[in-house]
Amino acid sequence: MDDTSFLLDWPRGNVTFAFEDFGGEQTSVQGLDRDVLSMRSALLGMAPEDDAAGKASLTLSVASHAAGVALVRFLYLGNYTIEGPDEIHDPQFLIHAQVLHLADAISCPELAKLAMGQLNYNAELAVSFPASPADLVQTLIFVYTHLPHLPEALSTMLNYCVASFTTHKLSEDADFKRLAGTHDSLLSDLSKVNAERGFGKYPPPSLRTATT
């Protein structure tokens, strides 16, 4: 997801996006064209400031370098995923939650819609796989921490957990059990979704005992 080789097909510009992730690590993507950036985000096209040498830069706070590169892919290509439309891939959640967070931060509804669509798609896809994606717990933590104002993201993740709780043996997953046992509202939120899906007012025994 962090491959920038697609930029080789475009004229080189003078704009650099500097990315700083939540851990303070800094990376960058150079050679961006201001006119291309402006086509999908007038804000990001205007925001980079020129220096005396005629070079422009903009620093963005991102959850990961991959999320920053995903933004650049979207600005250039109109999408940020690498897979073709008919290509089946292993589902993953975290990158799409991170891109959604970035899209919200820069007020880019088109990118936010794409990211939310990818999160929904991967959640639906993951149910048919034999095990849950490795980034499930990381994504739950990220959504609760950074996207509480976007309820659709949390709803998507909770519905996946309820739908696959038994088949993916989440009650036996050490990381999931640890999160369920320490998080303020995960179990109660899962119980609400369980009831909304018509599985009863209370969670199944495996869900009630997820922390044991």
Predicted regions and their residues:
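Alpha-helix initiation and N-capping motif
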Residues: 41, 68, 133, 183-187
